[in-house]
Amino acid sequence: MRKLACIFALALALPARAAEQKPQDVLPTTPFKEGDTISYADVDKLKDYLPPQFWENREFFFYEGMQLTVGPTERKYGTSDAYAAATEKHKGEAKLGEDGSLQNYQGGRPFPNETIDCKGDPNAGVKIIWNFNKAWNGSGGNAAWSYTYWDRGEQLPLYYEGTSRTVQLAHHVEPQYAENDGDIFPNEKRLGAFGIEVEAPFDARGILVLTYRYKSADGALKEAKNDDTWVFVPDLRRVRRISSAQRTDSVQGTDFTMDDLRSFSGIPPQYKWQCLGEKTVIAPVNTKTLAYPYTDTYNFGPYGFSYASDRWEVRDAWIVRFIPKNEDHPYHHKDIYIDKDTYEPLYSFAYDRKNELWKIIWHNHRYSEDWNGKVNKDPKAADGVWYPGWEGVDQPKNLRTVSDIIVNVQTGTGNRIEFWNNEGSPLSTKGKIRAYIDIGRLNKGR
């Protein structure tokens, strides 16, 4: 069951999001300029542009020999034209309902940035998290992944490798789905399906997981349906249905819960949300160096938890806090830094029931249009296509999470999940989609 718990968490986490531009953006004054290199001797320059909790635990992340490259300030990554059009078409339609639920949502960004008043609107926090939840993410996700467990620089034996796919079933913005109101199939009740296939280690090889999340999860708690999850275990040669209701339980052998991945992968109405403010931060946003599955030469630092030898950018971020409505939740609260342009997660900080800092979670990202050379080029090349367009989306224009790192600051242990080839193009036909999300696929063990 320990293996299944870890793998189930990964199934929910892995590829498992466009923003309005201000008419005249005024860039903040910072000590950084594009092309600068920051070494360990210079890290004090970063202090005012990092979350204080991150700076106080910087020994996990900054190290002798690091070479941090400064990228552009507040680059506008945008989104696909189709997502931007859906945002404009449905502007003003989405509303908040009971329990902070999302009502009347059809597609695109639910709440335009210019309508969010962090200081004056008590609902600003929940609006931000819905924008995060519904941000542009292509047609889902597809990746090869690696999961490793670390203890202050020592890689522990627990590890997994495999592939995963997220299939978005509702709220599509491509024109071909307009007749079904954005759904792939008529009368669809699911938001999406999430699958994972384990390839290593040998004793876990062949495990398959499939999870459904339902549209009702966006609604009031009294109407919400929990995720359904099935797992195929080769040793048992049968499919088991497992409970996914306890998403907040710590996964055995790890330092995170299922809802920790991507900083937050839970169900928003199960939490109270606050907007704590806005901050200009520097963060690893658009990697210039590849890692798993392309190579094992990425420098994660002496603790195995660092992106310091990569490209970082100055970004404007929302800071939101969730407070669990469930008194049995392991967290007192969590603070999440969310990029205001892309709604990608930057940093988050989870506090235990004693209100003491417990975990730091941060991420790296990769932008589709910076790797847009010839389709037949090696995707490992700097101009090699790894994320092509598809019908209705010629250019994905998608900044995607390609790695999650979770650090338990109380023990020095942590987890690293790498999926650098994460991309959001869909399966080529509805038939292939049906086959992938069919529970019967698990019975066949493939």
Where are these regions (language model features)?
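Positively charged n-region of N-terminal signal peptides that target proteins for export
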Residues: 1-4
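Hydrophobic h-region of N-terminal signal peptides that target proteins for export
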Residues: 6-17
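Non-transmembrane domains of secretory- and envelope-associated proteins
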Residues: 19-116, 236, 247-283, 287-307, ...
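Solvent-exposed N-terminal domain segments of exported/luminal and surface proteins
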Residues: 20-226, 233
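Extended beta-strand-rich segments in extracellular/periplasmic secretory proteins, especially
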Residues: 160-200, 261-336, 346
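Short, surface-exposed coil-to-beta transition loops
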Residues: 205-208, 225-226, 329-334, 346, ...
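A short, surface-exposed beta-strand/turn
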Residues: 211-217, 333-347
